[in-house]
């Protein structure tokens, strides 16, 4: 079976999973961040691990959609930004867990997240 055909046939499933993953991931990130900042390290770690599962779901569904879009540069750049966002999220959560100043990373997460969402809704186009 041609994997490109499989992805094309199931594109709406990948898209719905991807969109849902983003929404849940944003919530999980904020919950984990504030749990760490509030000194609830164990609960924060559990939520952080669940967020990592959603990182994987988001990456797999995003890569599948990128294949379906035949690696169009707009979506390729959006994917690179998403990988950077994951890095910023991990850095922000790590700093929050260690009780270090994490406001810079939190700001980076929010800025990149807003850019990616605006790209997703077609407000930012190039």
UniProtKB/Swiss-Prot annotation:
Listed HAMAP family: UPF0344
Keyword Transmembrane: yes
Name of one Pfam family that matches: DUF1516
Record has Cell membrane as a keyword: yes
Transmembrane segments: 16-36, 43-63, 66-86, 104-124
Protein name as annotated: UPF0344 protein ABC2900
Principal subcellular localization: membrane
InterPro entries: UPF0344
UniProt keyword annotations, A-Z: Cell membrane, Membrane, Transmembrane, Transmembrane helix
Any one GO cellular component localisation term in the record: plasma membrane
Compartments it resides in: Cell membrane
Family: Belongs to the UPF0344 family.
Topology in the lipid bilayer: Multi-pass membrane protein
